[in-house]
């Protein structure tokens, strides 16, 4: 099963769900879609999941596809899954700024996620993930420091 989550954000993420809809070729999909209007064909769908339900789906999944929300990414990582991350983009009206893009790029450079900025690359990323699953992420001091630095910068930008 491929688990797709748009997180608990109140904004729609139709771009991701439209790309997932194109995968609906018999692929076993569970999609947490939030307020988005698209329901991928053939997928089992839910508006929202409890934290425990989300963790269970991540543990069951062969691949996790998520927005680049820090909570969703860290939940996947803490449950031994290196997620495929599609950031919400400011220029497309999906976010108020590009914090998800910056976080996704930083997490990818640290080897924590597979970043897909253009949803045209999503099928390939999923196929590669399923053919040769990446090893579970192993936090190290550099990673912890990178995340701490990124979060400190992000909070500083919001306060400043």
What name fits each language-model region?
Residues 124, 128-160:
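C-terminal amphipathic helix plus adjacent low-complexity
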Residues 54-94:
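A donor-sugar binding/catalytic signature common to diverse glycosyltransferases
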Residues 28, 60-64, 111-113:
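Short active-site oxyanion
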Residues 1-60, 101:
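Donor-nucleotide binding loops and adjacent catalytic segments primarily
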Residues 11, 49-59, 67, 94-98, ...:
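Residues at secondary-structure transition points
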Residues 45-48, 113-122:
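Short acidic-hydrophobic, aromatic-tinged amphipathic segments that line or gate anion-handling sites
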Residues 82-117:
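Catalytic binding pocket for nucleotide-activated donors in carbohydrate/polymer assembly enzymes
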